[in-house]
Amino acid sequence: MTYTVIFSTAAEADLFAIYDYIAERAGAGIALRFVESIEVYCLGFANMPERGLRRDDLRPGLRTVGFRRRATILFEVDQTARRVVIHGVYYAGRSLEGLEESD
């Protein structure tokens, strides 16, 4: 059975910021391909949501998974609603510190 994958407003903002960052340094085409590849990877959680590392130390139910050694995807699996919520995409070593205090 598949899950619905939802990108939070914060995750969408992260993807736009990643696009802008890469586009300034490497061009719009490369930025677009990278961001689209993150989105496709996240949509894959629909079939296999229980991957990554549980990070209950940051927030109960939170999971993280690396993407191409350049980004960390933060997400939560809601078994009851059969959905995966992507909470954020941290690029190039952005710190997870203080996450437990944010929404």
Model-derived segments and spans:
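Basic/aromatic recognition patch in beta-strand/loop cores that engages polyanionic ligands
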Residues: 48-83
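Arg/Lys-rich, positively charged N-terminal/basic patches that mediate binding to nucleic acids
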Residues: 1-35
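Enriched for short, Lys/Arg-rich terminal
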Residues: 69-72, 76-103
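Generic structural signal for secondary-structure transition and capping sites
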Residues: 27, 43, 47-51, 70, ...
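Short, hydrophobic secondary-structure boundary micro-motifs
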Residues: 31, 53-55, 98
